[in-house]
Amino acid sequence: MMKPSIAEMLHRGRMLWIILLSTIALGWTTPIPLIEDSEEIDEPCFDPCYCEVKESLFHIHCDSKGFTNISQITEFWSRPFKLYLQRNSMRRLYTNSFLHLNNAVSINLGNNALQDIQTGAFNGLKILKRLYLHENKLDVFRNDTFLGLESLEYLQADYNVIKRIESGAFRNLSKLRVLILNDNLIPVLPTNLFKAVSLTHLDLRGNRLKVLFYRGMLDHIGRSLMELQLEENPWNCTCEIVQLKSWLERIPYTALVGDITCETPFHFHGKDLREIKKTELCPLLSDSEVEASLGIPHLSSSKENAWPTKPSSMLSSVHFTASSVEYKSSNKQPKPTKQPRTPRPPSTSQALYPGPNQPPIAPYQTRPPIPIICPTGCTCNLHINDLGLTVNCKERGFNNISELLPRPLNAKKLYLSSNLIQKIYRSDFWNFSSLDLLHLGNNRISYVQDGAFINLPNLKSLFLNGNDIEKLTPGMFRGLQSLHYLYFEFNVIREIQPAAFSLMPNLKLLFLNNNLLRTLPTDAFAGTSLARLNLRKNYFLYLPVAGVLEHLNAIVQIDLNENPWDCTCDLVPFKQWIETISSVSVVGDVLCRTPENLTHRDVRTIELEVLCPEMLHIAQPGPSPPQPGDYHPNGGPTSASPYEFSPPGGPVPLSVLILSLLVLFFSAVFVAAGLFAYVLRRRRKKLPFRSKRQEGVDLTGIQMQCHRLFEDSGGNSGGSGGGGRPTLSSPEKAPPVGHVYEYIPHPVTQMCNNPIYKPREEEEVAASAAQDTGATDRGGPGTQPTGMAEVLLGSEQFAETPKENHSNYRTLLEKEKEWALAVSNSQLNTIVTVNHHHPHPHHSAVGGVSGVGGGTGGDLAGFRHHEKNGGVVLFPPGGGCGGGSLLLDRERPQPAPCTVGFVDCLYGTVPKLKELHVHPPGMQYPDLQQDARLKETLLFSAGKGFTDHQTPKSDYLDLRAKLQTKPDYLEVLEKTAYRF
């Protein structure tokens, strides 16, 4: 047989490698089924539930399926199973409900709104080990509630409303190890409740427990206890709680998770029970007497059975428990310790203590998960639940916090009380950002640098009691935005700066008792949410309400006892304030020190008349309405500021003064703005069309003003014989060139200078005669009512020098009566303009009048006239005032002479002139004035012999085009006719 060649061997080797690599690759890409996944479901599931197999157990998930009764689950399972029935609607568990589910090892009934469990409801569940009843509405555990659960090891009933537990409720649960009853309403635990059980974990947080007695209660718990939680209960720290304190000193220090915080009495509120001495809790008895009276056994003299009494005694050993580890650091290099004895494992192979709502539980560790770094000379305790470290450095003789080396990791609580620390610097807490409690009490601290606690953002409790601090400033508390409890009692504090606590918005408790305070500054408590305040044993004579006590909106308790209150008028606001809060909120008495007649009397029992007699004098002046801030003997303040009271002659608070000034300022601004808007609107608003009576009234005003102007001018210029008719003053001289704006005549003066508006003597005589003759002359047939400002055209109308007839002149009163009569009889309210484009441009206006009845060439051609008292009144040739072309129109036909309202004639047809009359402008332009005078000359110069051949129309139009830049009322009258 031939041996294979080297080439064949190499080929075979390559093939083997290829096969091997292929096998490895195939193994990587092909999943290997796990034992758990390979298990087949050999049990039927129940619709609509979901089933699976985990860890050799059958899991049946029936959460949120709407079940109202256990009997609705009709399936039977022969193998051990876990049943999940969370978030259903089972209000009650009936007797023998679980008989067909006898193989269940865990049942979760959480969040079902359960209200009652009938006797024997759990019959048949002999192998059940875990029962979850959390988040229901159970209010009682009776002696027969848990019958049939002999194998139960874990019971979770948190977040219910349990108020009563009967003493035999757990007597049949001999294997119970974990009991979770947190967040219920349990006020007291009955005697011998835990006699038949051996608990390792007990959670009683968030109930209403005030005390736990030793006999029949604590003596049954401590036999195998590994973890105890008692937080968030209103513990009453008096003589009775000494039993609990003494018992806590006999169990491992780390077995207690959290603090036991005192609720009452008030001077212990917020303090840890373990930090209070027994002599303070019960000052009348010694420790041995207290223990003897309460039946607490003395510690055994044998070292083997002695438990450490306080953290400082645990100096030579390391204790490993279910939830914490204690480690002591010494000056020497620590030697390796022996492996501690492992605690007796729990009865179940699984973990026993899950979270509040999570069924799976991790097993407890017996070794610290991380290395412990503890400062030299201190004792450290590590809690497994949050990996927080408690550093105990009490009574170690430290002079500075910087001596704490090495710095611990994740320290939660740091106790440095009873040392020799004098100053606190900003750099002292550079590696303590995780602290939630810092105890610096009973040192010699007199200086705290601003921002010293800025590196402690998570700090919730700060103890600075029993030091030498004299002043509190806002900078001291910078960075303490999470602080809840602050203790400053037994210092020498004399001064608190304004807004000292404003940087601590979450502050709930503040102790300032036993200091040297005499007053509190403004805004001392602004920005805080204080619920408890202790001001006991200071030197307060009174406390201001405004700016101080008024900020205590969330106050629950306040201690004001042992202060030298001065019961005078200054105390009235304070008295009113303490009467408005609940009587339960004020701890103790508020006794007067002065004056002598009120010594040792409670401020709340003194009437206001006795406290402040001056108030009687203030209240006597009578029935004036109550003003804000007033106090009355039988009542409180009458305003929303119930504590703003100033004694007689006292100064007005600055805040009230500033507020009043602001109110006045804004009121003045709004009033001024309103007036400005009103005036502006009035200026811009156009006058509406008016009635005939309003036109007459306006005309009367203008006429009277013109008459006054005539008489004033006549008086100034004099008259012949002293009785001459007053004449209008001569027109003003034109201003010199370059000063065209220096003289601006008033429009009324210019208007009255126009001869067409001057009253004629014949008209005055006729009006006087009409007034004398009475109603007969006015109302007889054939008579015409006197027109209001009749338009008279004729040679006599334009005479520049009227006739001297003293009998025709009347007083101003007579003229006013005449104008009033004319107003009442006025019938006309419209005017039409004269047409300038007539076929005979060379005819003058006067010529047209001369030819009434047949002349048609002038501007007034076609008008017929009516002579009355020597005057001429024009009538249209047809229509209302006679025949001919219309110059004057009326609303309805009347044979009376036509009269024209003067004001409406001027302003009714030209809005711009009306606006000029209402708001005279500041100036007038010379060209407009000259144009108006030129028109006046052209229109009314007939009396001076002006004829049509002297000024042809073309020259007039050229001259007017040169002088006039804006239309005036005469131009408008010449071109357009309006009816209004």
Swiss-Prot record:
Residues bearing glycans: N69, N597
InterPro entries given in the database record: Cys-rich_flank_reg_C (IPR000483), Leu-rich_rpt (IPR001611), Leu-rich_rpt_typical-subtyp (IPR003591), LRR_dom_sf (IPR032675)
The keyword Repeat is annotated on this UniProt entry: yes
First and last residues of every LRR repeat: 79-100, 103-124, 127-148, 151-172, 175-196, 198-219, 410-431, 434-455, 458-479, 482-503, 506-527, 529-550
Keywords: Glycoprotein, Leucine-rich repeat, Membrane, Repeat, Signal, Transmembrane, Transmembrane helix
Segments in the Cytoplasmic topological domain: 677-980
Ranges for domain LRRNT: 365-407
Gene Ontology CC annotation, any one: membrane
Membrane topology reported for the UniProt record: Single-pass type I membrane protein
LRRCT domain sequence ranges: 233-284, 563-614
Protein name: SLIT and NTRK-like protein 3
